[in-house]
């Protein structure tokens, strides 16, 4: 006896008289599947125990419906909308280079790229191979940009935040879709896969020994680097540091390029050195050395300053990976490229080894390997009013959970966050059940 998947229609509320062959319906259908495959990003705006529970199951539903799509065009358009839903915000940064016309063009190009990748997966003859192809898209990193990662499916829910959890999610989707297995075998296989991918343990991460404070700033990108604002913004930061000292903090962490200039040999460097006798200061700023400009982390400690330079640079934001002359002539005329620092910078605080990460670097898996604590500085004002920072946080949560790392993230433009390895959702449900029953008593 075979299990028919009548419980997985595209929309159960669609009227029977609606023409399911119409272009509008087909667009709605592929867009809905793309939403399911992007649900983790948008449900993260409403994070609670219920959204966390359903998120991976919505992803499974999306994968099942993807497999039910029987034409290469459907695969293309699903990939197209997935690319846009994940990365529509990338074009927003072009506003600050006076390239406003690129805001809608860039997402369309990205959607087209992922549409082609999904369509290539359809060319594989068997459904299982197609699903394997979709899984492998996560390992394609154009220009080193690795933010398309199915691992975000496991940040929420019962599945282990690792490749074990991800693979089980994909296999569950395949066996739910597969029509040549009897109902009872199918149920057994899905249950085995669910418990194989289940999170049974919580990884323990080191936390900072020092009493710390994360400073959050909210300076818009179009105002941040204006010469007339540098002094007033810097003076506010000094006041924030003094406030942390009054609060008896031992460490204060400021965002990326909090001081939006080269700190060396300025009055603010002298002030920070003096204040560092009372509190350790970590801040972002530029660093110019021998005609090289770096996006850097400055560490002020007991009158000394240590500078760590960013290695992973944002393509076409901090470096131009190719066609440099053409790009500078017609598009990024005023861009100043950054130079690269060491691949993984570390320093010591209170006998703890800290990994340095600046914005984009906080989502690089290499920085989580052989790390215990990461202090990350970001400027999210580049992509204000977007889902960029939520995707960034999901990637950080995935890697922090996978490797057992704690992340202390100070930002400009969005809220600060401290990330620890994923807790057991089953525990949260158990605690919620106890609260409900205790209230009834």
From Swiss-Prot:
PROSITE patterns: CN_HYDROLASE. Coiled coil: none annotated. InterPro entries: Apolipo_AcylTrfase, C-N_Hydrolase, C-N_Hydrolase_sf. Pathway: Protein modification; lipoprotein biosynthesis (N-acyl transfer). GO terms for molecular function: N-acyltransferase activity. Residues 215-441 form the CN hydrolase domain. Keywords: Acyltransferase, Cell inner membrane, Cell membrane, Membrane, Transferase, Transmembrane, Transmembrane helix. The chain crosses the membrane at residues 23-43, 45-65, 75-95, 97-117, 133-153, 156-176, 178-198. It is found in: Cell inner membrane. One of its GO terms (biological process) is lipoprotein biosynthetic process. It comes from the Bacteria. GO terms for cellular component: plasma membrane. The active site is at residues 256, 310, 359. Its EC number is 2.3.1.269. It is a multi-pass membrane protein. Belongs to the CN hydrolase family. Apolipoprotein N-acyltransferase subfamily. Catalyzes the phospholipid dependent N-acylation of the N-terminal cysteine of apolipoprotein, the last step in lipoprotein maturation. This is Apolipoprotein N-acyltransferase. The gene is lnt.
């Amino acid at each position: 006896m075979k299990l028919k998947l009548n419980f997985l229609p595209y929309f159960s509320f669609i009227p029977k008289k609606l023409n399911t062959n119409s272009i509008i319906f087909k667009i709605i259908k592929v867009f809905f599947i793309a939403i399911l495959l992007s649900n983790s990003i948008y449900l993260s705006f409403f994070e609670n125990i219920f959204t966390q529970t359903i998120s991976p199951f919505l992803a499974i539903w999306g994968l099942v419906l993807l497999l039910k799509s029987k034409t290469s065009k459907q695969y293309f358009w699903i990939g197209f909308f997935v690319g846009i839903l994940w990365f529509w915000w990338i074009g927003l940064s072009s506003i600050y280079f006076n390239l406003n016309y690129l805001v809608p063009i860039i997402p369309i190009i990205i959607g087209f790229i992922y549409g082609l990748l999904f369509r290539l997966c359809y060319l594989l003859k068997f459904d299982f191979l197609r699903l394997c192809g979709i899984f492998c898209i996560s390992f394609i990193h154009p220009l080193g940009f690795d933010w398309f990662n199915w691992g975000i499916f496991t940040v929420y829910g019962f599945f282990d935040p690792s490749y074990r959890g991800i693979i089980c999610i994909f296999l569950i989707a395949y066996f739910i879709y597969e029509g040549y297995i009897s109902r009872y075998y199918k149920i057994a296989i899905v249950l085995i896969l669910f418990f194989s991918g289940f999170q049974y343990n919580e990884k323990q991460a080191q936390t900072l020994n020092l009493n710390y404070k994360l400073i959050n700033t909210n300076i818009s990108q179009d105002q941040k680097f204006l010469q007339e604002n540098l002094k007033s913004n810097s003076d506010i930061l000094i006041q924030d540091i003094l406030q942390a000292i009054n609060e008896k903090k031992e460490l204060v962490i400021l965002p990326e390029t909090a001081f939006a200039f080269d700190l060396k040999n300025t009055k603010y460097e002298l002030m920070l050195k003096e204040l560092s006798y009372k509190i350790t200061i970590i801040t972002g700023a530029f660093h110019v050395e021998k005609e090289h400009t770096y996006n850097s982390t400055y560490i002020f400690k007991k009158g000394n300053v240590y500078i760590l330079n960013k290695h992973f640079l944002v393509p076409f934001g901090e470096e131009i990976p190719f066609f440099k002359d053409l790009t500078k002539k017609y598009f990024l005329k005023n861009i100043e490229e950054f130079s690269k620092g060491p691949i993984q910078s570390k320093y010591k605080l209170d006998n703890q080894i800290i990994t340095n990460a600046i914005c984009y670097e906080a989502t690089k898996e290499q920085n989580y390997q052989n790390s215990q604590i990461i202090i990350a500085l970001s400027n999210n004002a580049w992509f204000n009013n977007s889902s960029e920072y939520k995707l960034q946080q999901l990637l950080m949560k995935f890697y922090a959970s996978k490797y057992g790392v704690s992340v202390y993230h100070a930002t400009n433009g969005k809220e600060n966050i401290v990330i620890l390895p994923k807790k057991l959702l089953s525990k949260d449900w158990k605690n919620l059940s106890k609260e409900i029953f205790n209230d009834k008593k």
